[in-house]
């Protein structure tokens, strides 16, 4: 189950990544590479991480016209990443095009990357969604709508809050992948995310994967913090 614990490499460049990963010599991680790091270092950072034996969630949240997304996904699949994502708000045609691009670009003999969609960012509150985005639904209804559309479009799952997982299991079934960021240890600050949970709570609510950033990357001892999160996520009593 440790491979369903994703560590967010929210760093500005490769030097910071190298320094962080020194704490994990010999440990094969599942890491998330986001916009900041990928836009700075480009595909070379993916090659570097793959050579180290790590699995990669390339978190670029594509949202564009279908043809552009298809072409972009073809390129991303050729990098041999393990997971990618789009914004569900891009619509069904765009999401279907994403899958087509991944199938065309995947390396020979390998499965395409897992493809998930963002429903609502964990920084989005219901008030913000209604007043600023203009969606006149409850947050739960909006997330469920996007999740259902995602499944119908052939994607593997969604990025969502842990709090939304039980409802999505009802709507989309137990095989539908739920990747949940906003994970913090109980002692941590929540920072800029509104809908957060502990690893233990994420496990109880049925998340497929959890994404953990600052609780590990900003810890005085990242390896020990990783082990603590892993134990809580796996339900290990120490």
Swiss-Prot record:
GO biological process: 'de novo' pyrimidine nucleobase biosynthetic process; 'de novo' UMP biosynthetic process
Residues annotated as transmembrane: none
Binding site for substrate: 10, 32, 59-68, 122, 184, 193, 213-214
Molecular function via GO: orotidine-5'-phosphate decarboxylase activity
SUPFAM superfamilies: Ribulose-phoshate binding barrel
Active site: 61 (proton donor)
GO cellular component: cytosol
Enzyme Commission designation: 4.1.1.23
InterPro entries noted in UniProt: Aldolase_TIM, OMPdecase, OMPdecase_AS, OMPdecase_bac, OMPdeCOase_dom, RibuloseP-bd_barrel
Enzyme class name: lyase
Record-linked Pfam families: OMPdecase
PROSITE patterns: OMPDECASE
Reactions mediated catalytically: orotidine 5'-phosphate + H(+) = UMP + CO2
CDD domains in alphabetical order: OMP_decarboxylase_like
Subunit structure and binding partners: Homodimer.
NCBIfam families, per the entry: PRK00230.1, pyrF
Family the entry assigns: Belongs to the OMP decarboxylase family. Type 1 subfamily.
Name of the molecule in the record: Orotidine 5'-phosphate decarboxylase
Organism expressing this protein natively: Bacillus thuringiensis subsp. konkukian (strain 97-27)
């Amino acid at each position: 189950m440790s491979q369903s614990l994703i560590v967010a490499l929210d760093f500005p460049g490769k030097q910071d990544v190298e320094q962080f990963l020194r704490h994990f010599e010999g440990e094969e991680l599942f890491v998330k590479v986001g916009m900041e790091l990928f836009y700075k270092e480009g595909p070379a950072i993916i090659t570097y991480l793959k050579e180290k034996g790590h699995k990669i969630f390339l978190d670029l949240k594509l949202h564009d016209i279908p043809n552009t997304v298809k072409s972009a996904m073809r390129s991303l699949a050729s990098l041999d990443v393990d997971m990618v994502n789009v914004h569900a708000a891009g619509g069904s045609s765009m999401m279907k095009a994403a899958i087509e691009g991944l199938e065309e670009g995947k390396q020979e003999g390998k499965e395409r990357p897992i493809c998930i969609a963002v429903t609502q960012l964990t920084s989005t509150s219901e008030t913000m969604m209604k007043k600023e985005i203009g969606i006149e639904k409850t947050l739960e209804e909006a997330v469920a709508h996007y999740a259902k559309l995602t499944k119908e479009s052939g994607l593997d799952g969604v990025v969502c809050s842990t709090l939304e997982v039980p409802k999505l299991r009802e709507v989309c079934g137990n095989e539908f992948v739920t990747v949940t960021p906003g994970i913090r240890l109980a002692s941590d600050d929540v920072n800029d995310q509104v809908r957060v949970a502990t690893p233990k709570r994420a496990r109880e609510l049925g998340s497929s994967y959890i994404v953990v950033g600052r609780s590990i990357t900003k810890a005085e001892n990242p390896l020990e913090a990783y082990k603590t999160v892993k134990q809580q996520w796996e339900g290990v009593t120490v």
